[in-house]
A protein has these predicted regions:
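Conserved catalytic-core motifs of GNAT/GCN5-like acyltransferases
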Residues: 121-125, 138-153
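A short, well-structured alpha-helix characteristic of acyl/acetyltransferase catalytic modules
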Residues: 1-40, 44
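Acetyl-CoA-dependent GNAT
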Residues: 36-86, 92-94
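Amphipathic alpha-helical recognition patches that constitute DNA-binding helices
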Residues: 15, 86, 90, 103-104, ...
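Short strand-connecting beta-turns/loops that link adjacent beta-strands
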Residues: 10, 67-69, 79-82, 127, ...
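Conserved beta-strand-loop-alpha-helix junction that forms the acyl-donor binding cleft
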Residues: 92, 121-132
């Protein structure tokens, strides 16, 4: 399986909108409200912040499979709350269970390391099945509450 990263253009944000508004894709996000509205009138500001203003605090890319089809997104950003860089990976529901999540997480960790980041974190809902993926990829439990588990990986 071959995955490549792709820096989306503004007009490519239809894919992010599709994922965020898809109930099955966003089921992992139920602890934080599930689906997320991403209307076109918010695209410019979002794109400016995540793509144009590259200050080293954020990274965002789509994942494309060997056929050139968008299958998900990977990102990280600095969190003042956690005092560290938080991972984000979303695989569109119809492309799950095909290894894209594992490969995307590996790519994200490699990019973060290349960009000088030493630790990557993610706070995941306690019942999210993706926890096992993160643990298999070298993340360790930092702590947990009744709602979330905070995972950390030294890069």
């Amino acid at each position: 399986m071959e995955l490549e990263t792709y820096l989306p253009k503004l007009e490519d944000l239809w894919f992010r909108k599709t994922m965020l508004e898809d109930e099955e894709t966003m089921s992992y996000n139920h602890a934080w409200g599930g689906t997320v509205s991403f209307p076109k009138d918010r695209w410019n500001d979002w794109y400016q912040y995540w793509v144009i203003e590259d200050d080293g605090q954020r990274y965002y890319r789509y994942l494309k499979n060997e056929k050139g089809v968008f299958v998900g997104e990977i990102a990280y950003h600095y969190s003042d709350f956690y005092h560290g860089y938080m991972a984000n990976i979303i695989i569109y529901s119809k492309y799950r269970h095909q290894g894209y999540g594992r490969e995307g997480l590996k790519i994200l960790c490699e990019v973060a390391k290349e960009n000088g980041i030493t630790y990557l974190y993610d706070d995941i809902a306690i019942d999210n099945p993706a926890i096992s993926l993160f643990l298999k990829e070298g993340f360790v439990e930092e702590y947990r509450t009744e709602e979330i588990i905070l995972l950390k990986k030294q890069l």
